[in-house]
Amino acid sequence: MTSNAGEGRGLARSLVLVLGIAVLLGLAGALVGMRAFAAQAPPEELSNDELLSRVARATGDPPAFSASITVEQSVLPAQLLEASGQEGGPPALSGPLSARVWYGGPTQLRAELQGENGDRIFVRNGSRVWIYDGAENTVRTGEGVPEQETPDEEPVTPTGVNRLLDELAPTSELSQQEPVEVAGRQAYVLVLSPRDEGATLVDRAQMLVDSETYLPLRFAVYADERPDPVFSYQVSSLDVGPVPADLFDFQTPPGAEVLPLEQGAEPREQERPEGAEPTQVETVAEAQRLVDFRIRELPDPPGDRELTGVYLKNGDGVVLTYGSGWGTVVFAQGQGDGDAAMPPEAGDAEANGLQQLPTVDLGGGVEAQEISTPIGSGLSWSADGVGYVLAGSVPASELEQAARGLR
């Protein structure tokens, strides 16, 4: 594994972790092409907690449906996304990605994706999986990851939703706007925004929710002072009802090469080892007793943020957090060349694109790879046998200043 590859992967994973608050809560599209209801009656008035409860129940057990979807992003650079792609997986989201999706149940799914790097088709029917790569004219097929035998999940309760809202309340404001029409359907509009606008580059996140099925129809994340979303997921058409069974019977295209399905083409979450999640400890001194390298604290954190958390990762890495909520800055470190925040399943194939990331001089002969995006930035570097990753929803210049303070 090369130093640059490890640094870039660690940077990418940490940056995604920090920015994930916005993308995961994610949350709905630009209002272009939408209109408030005039002729139609507005949907039932719901409180925030009741609407969130219905969304959680609907996404946990969705009805059969077919939909046309478009995803766009201008957050991460194309070479990083292409480098982090996986063989047999979906095309990297370096440009608009259009997809047609048919869902017949937990083990019946068909997705046809159109991207700049060629079309892909993914089909699951029972335990059988097919993945077609139009650019290579290859089909990978085999038994997919089996359904896990787990007890039924507890239903979403008002208490659970209220607990979530209580956790969000100190740093975030959740509100509803006037209902709109999207994809010919009535939709609720939820808006999540940071209370401390100066602590983050994220302006707001929005979600449009279908008033009939309570499935999300659009998501978007907006950066500060930018009118267009930097990440958006949009459903342009949605048909709810039974899906023809023959859509889940994959027909191999003429001349296509058929190859065995590799487990690497399945979701990487299946590969995560036990203990992969960070474990919080009380102090830096306690963490220092458990690792074999010197833990560094930021002498000049961005925006004078205070140390708010100390975490052990995979037994040989440490993650320090500064600040809270949307403005959290993460400082990960561990023995090796930039692998402090890198999950063990990442492979060497990512190196080529990662080497193209820009570098900045931190002084003392140390250079860092840098990602700068509209909603956050990240640095990754190595010094004296220790890899470091610094990331947060702050300008890159603030991270550079904090990193130089370590010299």
Go through each PLM region and give its residues.
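Extracellularly exposed regions in secreted/surface proteins, prominently low-complexity, repeat-rich
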Residues: 208-213, 220-221, 227, 239-266, ...
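Gly/Pro-enriched, hydrophobic low-complexity segments
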Residues: 112, 175-259
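C-terminal region of N-terminal signal peptides and the immediate post-cleavage residues
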Residues: 6-8, 26-58
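A short, Trp-centered hydrophobic/proline-enriched beta-strand micro-motif
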Residues: 57-82, 107-111
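N-terminal Sec-pathway targeting helices
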Residues: 2-23
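Short, hydrophobic/aromatic-rich segments at coil-to-beta transitions
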Residues: 64-68, 105-110, 184-191, 215-218, ...
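Short, solvent-exposed recognition patches
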Residues: 75-96, 266-386, 393-401
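An acidic-aromatic
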Residues: 98-158, 228-232, 379
